[in-house]
Amino acid sequence: VTDDPAAVPAAEREYSAHTPDEMVWVRVLGSGRVLGVQLEPPVMRRPGSEIAAAIQACADVAYLEGQVALRAEFEQRGAPADGISWMPTAADLERARARLRSLR
């Protein structure tokens, strides 16, 4: 057992994201499985569509963080560029982060 997160494969690490106001949190496994959603009580006064959009935006960021880390692992192992071209990139992650930052 190690305390070094880099020693754990990206697919097995946990990634989390939250809204700027910290009212919605989502935790995702690097493989993409959602591990948890946390909603702070004040967010429950918002319309359901806003809450759903916040959950989706958080899940997207957490998922993409894991996928970008996984892609980096593949690149380090010498995977050919065309073999991982379908995987999300840092640019995809930044677009998701920008969308999340735009939420209230």
Predicted regions and their residues:
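Short, acidic, Ser/Thr-enriched surface-loop or helix-capping motifs
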Residues: L29
